[in-house]
């Protein structure tokens, strides 16, 4: 594996203690800067004990700040943070704690956008809230050093280092394809873990959906670049369009054998719009709203332009 070759070459270099301290000092600085974009999500449940006394239970999750304006700070978090919550509180890295509310959710990808009104903060407090920089995950390469932030160790504001071990391109998923990054790094997807490059940019978020049955120690991350269009919709409170199709492009070879160009359907998710419209495996989706579908990227782009409802 590439990361083993990298380690082997590093081991050959006669690093001094000063070199190591400088290298790890730079990494600590990078982690500290990235951590300023991490927020703690307190998922609060209001319950009663055996004696009918009101009690509160709180779950802890990590989110990443996507945008910061005083009237609205937006935090991307896993849907687990809101599934059983009666109310939400958001604690920023400077310890400011404010009520949160769900702005929009994408259950297909397991993500939710939480909004916070920060007008009660003074300028000094607000300036400590740092929106994350979105990186280009298409530029991530096998062997790259990466950092997981959020809750990789199960606690908010924990972190871990590792290498990209493998990149799976064009992985089939509902309504398109995606790039999945595999890294030998700590990660806890349901608590909120986010992947950063060495520029301090967000390049992915943790998911359990594509982990292998055999425990290899590899953790999986969805590519942020594949999700930027949907991320903009969530930020504006718009529901991400959903058809519920799993399929593959009709190749030129398939066309030579008489198939129509478009997307060959492999499955339709139960109770999805595609399923309810009667689409089934073997059908070919050749267009959306009179626009010809010529490939998977084109299909994904057209789905994102649809309006829910």
Predicted regions and their residues:
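Active-site region of chymotrypsin-like
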Residues: 119-131, 160-217, 255, 259-267
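Catalytic-histidine neighborhood of serine endopeptidases
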Residues: 68-112, 116-119, 128
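Beta-strand/loop subdomains of soluble extracytoplasmic proteins
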Residues: 84-102, 141-145, 157-170, 179, ...
């Amino acid at each position: 594996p590439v990361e083993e070759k990298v380690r082997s070459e590093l081991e050959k270099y006669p690093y001094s203690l000063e070199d190591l301290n400088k290298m790890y000092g730079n990494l600590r600085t990078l982690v500290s800067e990235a951590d300023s974009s991490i927020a703690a999500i307190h998922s609060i449940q209001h319950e009663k004990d055996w004696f009918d006394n009101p009690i509160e239970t709180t779950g802890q999750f990590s989110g990443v700040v996507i945008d910061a304006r005083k009237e609205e700070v937006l935090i991307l978090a896993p849907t687990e943070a809101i599934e059983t919550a009666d109310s939400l509180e958001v604690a920023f890295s400077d310890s400011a704690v404010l009520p949160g509310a769900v702005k929009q959710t994408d259950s297909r990808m397991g993500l939710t956008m939480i909004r916070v009104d920060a007008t009660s903060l003074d300028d000094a407090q607000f300036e400590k809230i740092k929106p994350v920089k979105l990186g280009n995950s298409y530029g991530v390469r096998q062997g790259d050093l990466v950092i997981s932030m959020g809750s990789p160790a199960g606690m908010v504001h924990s972190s871990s280092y590792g290498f990209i071990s493998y990149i799976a391109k064009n992985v089939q998923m509902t309504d398109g394809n995606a790039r999945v990054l595999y890294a030998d790094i700590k990660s806890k997807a349901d608590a909120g873990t986010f992947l950063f490059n060495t520029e301090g940019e967000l390049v992915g978020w943790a998911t359990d959906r594509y982990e292998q049955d055999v425990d290899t120690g590899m953790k999986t991350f969805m590519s942020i670049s594949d999700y930027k269009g949907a991320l903009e919709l969530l930020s504006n409170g718009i529901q991400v369009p959903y058809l519920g199709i799993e399929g593959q492009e009709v190749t030129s070879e398939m066309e030579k054998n008489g198939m129509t160009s478009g997307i060959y359907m492999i499955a339709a998710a139960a109770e999805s719009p595609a399923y309810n419209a009667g689409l089934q495996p073997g059908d070919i989706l050749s267009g959306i709203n009179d626009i010809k579908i010529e490939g998977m990227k084109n299909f994904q782009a057209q789905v994102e332009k649809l309006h829910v409802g």
